[in-house]
Structures are given as C-alpha cells and as structure tokens.
Amino acid sequence: MLGKALLLLLSSPICAWAQSAADYYVKSIPGQPDGPLLKMHAGHVEVDAETNGHLFFWHFQNRHIANRQRTILWLNGGPGCSSMDGALMEIGPYRVKDDHTLIYNNGSWDEFANLLFVDQPVGTGFSYVNTNSYLHDLDHVAAHMITFLEKWFAMFPEYESDDLYIAGESYAGQYIPHIARAIVERNKNIQRNQQHWPIKGLLIGNGWISPRDQYPANLQYAYAEGIVKEGTAIANELDGIEKSCDEQLNAPGAGDLVDIRQCESILNKLLDLTRTSDDQCINVYDIRLKDATCGNAWPPDLDQMTDYLRRADVGAALNLDNGKANGWTECNNQVTANFRMGHNGVPSIQLLPGLIESGVKVLLFSGDRDLICNHLGTESLIHNMKWSGGTGFETKPGVWAPRRGWTFEGEAAGYYQQARNLTYVLFYNASHMVPYDFPRRTRDMVDRFINVDIANIGGPPADSRLDGEKLPQTSVGNTTSSTSGTDQVDEAKLKDAEWKAYTKSGEAALIVVIIGVSVWGFFIWRARQRAARDGTSPTKKGYRAVYQDGVDNNSSTDGAGLLSRFRNQSNSNSSRDLEARDFDEAELDSLTPNLQNGHERDHYVIGEEDEDEDNDIGNGAKSSLH
C-alpha cells in the first residue's frame, strides 16, 4: 500500500511543477564556434499525459534588447516537418558545416528577439507520442500549443510578457493562424491566475493558406515561368486536370477543406510530364534546380544537419528524453498521413481577416523561385481577401496600395506592399526557404516588422530602401558585442524573474518532499501501531512496503532506487504501444520508403492518396510543405 501511495504521489501534477528552467539549460553544444556560448534551453514538455505526447523545443535568448523584449515562436510545416530546419538552416544563430562544426548565421533573427523553435505536431522531429495517437486536425494542434506555452511560461516567466510573434513557412500557414486564434480566445477568457499573452504579429513565408487561390496557381506559375508551354500536349493534359480541380473547388463545402485530392494531382502530373530523359525533374522548392527526387534531398545542408542531430552527444546536450536522440528525421510521413485521414479543420484564410481586425499584424512573404507554394497563389489570396472594410490592398475604393521596389545594400531585393495591417514582401531569386537564401535580407524584414529601435545598440546601419527612399535604420549582423544601457536594465529584470521562477520551482519541490516524508511516516506509524496490537515486532517487514510488489529489498536504494523503478514502470509500454519517435539508427536504416528512408522526406499531397499512386513523384515521394 505504501509503495503504491508514494508512486501515486510522485506521479501527481505537483511533481511535474517541480521541473524548472535549470533542467533545460544547454551547458554546451558539440561543434560550437569560438566565443561565449549563446544562452540556450532545450528539451521535452508534456502536452498530453494520456497519449504520452511531448513537444520538443529549442530556445535561444536574444543577443540584444532593443527598447523592449520580443519572442518569436517558429514553426516549420509538412505537416510533420521539424522546426530544426528553421533553427539550423534558416533563422537560427547556427549553421552546420560538413565536419559537424557550427558557424554563426550572420542574419540570425536572435539579434533582437528570443527564438523559440518547437517540433509539432506530436511525433514531428524530436517530439514524440504513442503511435496510435497522432493528431488529425488543426484544433488539436492549437490546443497542444496552448498547453505547451502554459507550461513553458510557467518555467520561463521572464518571457511571458514579451511581445509575441509567431512565424513559419509552408504548411505552417495553416498552423500559425489557428494557434493565433487560440491565443486570442485564451486572452479573452483569461482566468484570474493567468497572464495575458501580448500576441503582436504573424509572419508566414511561402505559406499554404488558401486552397481556393493556391491550387490553380501551380499551373499558372508553370506557364508564367515557361516550365510548360500553352497549347502543347502536356498543357492540354494539365488543363483537363485543372478543370476537374476547379469543379471540386466550387463544390458545396469545398471552402471548408484544407486538402483536395483532385487538385493535388496537378502538381504531381506536372512533375511527371516534365521529367527529363535522364530522370531529372524540377525541384518544387526552387525551379532553378533539377534532380531525381524533385527537390526531396534539398537543401544541401540537410545531409550534415541530419547526421549532426542524430549524434548521441548532440541529443544529450539538447536534454532529449532517453531513447529519443537517434531517430530524428526532417519530415515524419506518419504524422502527415494521420493528419490527412479526416477533415483537419477550416483553411486558415478564413481566420486571417478576423485576426488582422483584432489588432494582430500579418506579414506574408514569398520567394519567387518556389513552385509548391508559389507567389502567384499568395498574391491571389491577398487580392481576394476582405478585411477591415476593404478588399485586398485597397486604400480606398478602387485605389490599391502601390508596390514599392526594395533594394538592400545596393541590390534589387524585391518589393513591399502594405495596407490595413497586412504586409506582403516578394523576394527576388529566392526559394521556398527564403531565410536559407537571404538570411540578412529576411532579418532586415523582420526587424522592421517587429519595430526594432536600434538607437542604443550601435553598429553601422544596413542600406535598405523602398523606391530609393532610405528606410529607418537597422543593423543586420553588425551590432556591437557590448550590451546597451537598455539591455542592462532589462537584464536585471530578467534575472529577477528567473530567480522568482527558480524559487517557485524549489518551493514546489520542497512541498513534494515534505508530503512524501509525511505519508511515509504515517504508514510507518500505522504499521507500528498494528504490530503493537498484534504482538509482533515492527522490524524490516514494516519497511518492505516502501518497495513495489515483487521488488527485492536488496535492490539498490542509492539516489535512483524507488524513483528509477517508478520511471521504468511508467515509461514501459506494451510491444504494440510504441512511441512515434522511439527507434534507433539500425531501425532507421531498415525503414521502407514509405517510412522516411534516410534523409528523404515524403512528398506532401494535399488530399488522400490511393495505394497505387506511391510512385507519382521522385521514385515514390510526394512533396512536403516543410
């Protein structure tokens, strides 16, 4: 009885509360560059105890504070593609070299904002869940993120009052507005003991947002870029598929669907019909490139990043739960397949107008060399969207905001267009992953969007202009290493908040110990009383109950005794109840193509697939919106 009581106590929420920021601190990272280590935290946070659902995060503290604190939550897409893409190939402070050493990203977004990368939904990247418990809809994705943030801010309260921005790319164009709406609703119904989360803006790059506007844009883009020539046999076949797609898009209820199978076949067939005699096809993420997988092995950094993240010492540095370090893959097609099994929620295009009208700024940006979520589709959805009393970029009826040419450090970079709290930026010569191609330009863009004031930071300003007019100063990658006076004041506030958080965690841990000792003492007292009545001696027999049934008293009790047995029992699952990310390197090598062999990712299909369609693209792969 006593053993079971103590196990119940240790598994209570109080024990979970005892976890603190210190448990997630990253002391060092393999291959780190010379110089002081950036302040980082990483690890798993439980979001669903019933399904063993845990989300992995990697957090980087900002290097400077410009007038106020900001946090950017970054999500990659898929669904089922890891946000480590964003951390190590796009906006994070490090890039991985061939020899697994890390170099600084000169355009990292952590210069003036805290960065929080989260692998989600559960089962993505380093996150995990029981294999029969993958998510199927966007509402559950948003609910898990709210749970994650509640727990994360409880451990890191110094960031809870930061201006909050949510950013990402591709299928995150669905995640981000749904999560933002959940935050807005939470703020409206806030409880007395909760803090308001100041959500300020959303940034979506080459996002999948509006099926009605973006499916037809695939063929439009192919014609515009000369991938397909109108009037040819290939064009006629594709036109027929597009006609069927258009019928589906206009069918009753189609406006509430994120995935439409018939429309997805346009891109699949386009890639098949344009494959060359030497088995090369267009890279759907960058049409300037061709390979046998249609972009599945792109970008080039993916190989070394995958090997790096599978290293045991990297997993240990990132505080991964036991057994979770070996199985990282960029995109988990089991997450993708399960997400497509049912109606996964309304398209995010239905949420954007309300979010903008509630005061949340939105920035959409596109690389003009991307096919799979191309800029024509994004421009079409903006043109047709109605919000704040107007349609598209109207400034007044019949008058649209102009496109303003953008130059960065003397080169034509793209253009800006803005109206009524929505900004659109087109990047010239950029792929699906714009920050991968142009980290400094995207840093300039994000600093302007989040209203960074660098007056007290120092460093030569970047030369960024719209229509030749010099913009307010930003300093991309050139800030001084010293901390400004504003930094010092805010640093003191952060340390005070951190100390309070650690104190709170310590108090919770002390409560656990006190209650545990009290319960233990009560049962010992009861045992002695019973022994006195029965005339027996309260010897070791009274203490045997501390151990679980069937566990020998001679088992080790050194620091890991009872607790380690409790963990082993709670973490053991039946052979059928495997965890989504719980496999080792040997198992990875034996996976079939349907289960993400090596570094290839499953091409994403917006809609369901037939079994006999597995070979539609790139030797059995469909394009991921990663």
UniProtKB/Swiss-Prot annotation:
Keyword ATP-binding tagged: no
PANTHER family xref list: PHEROMONE-PROCESSING CARBOXYPEPTIDASE KEX1, SERINE PROTEASE FAMILY S10 SERINE CARBOXYPEPTIDASE
Gene that encodes the chain: kex1
Name assigned to this protein: Pheromone-processing carboxypeptidase kex1
Biased composition (Low complexity): 474-486, 564-575
Annotated EC: 3.4.16.6
Glycan-bearing residues: N106, N421, N429, N478
Transmembrane segments: 505-525
Family: Belongs to the peptidase S10 family.
Compartment(s): Golgi apparatus, trans-Golgi network membrane
Bilayer topology annotation: Single-pass type I membrane protein
Lineage, broadest ranks: Eukaryota, Fungi, Dikarya, Ascomycota, Pezizomycotina
Signal peptide range in chain numbering: 1-18
Segments on the Cytoplasmic face: 526-626
A Gene Ontology biological process term: apoptotic process
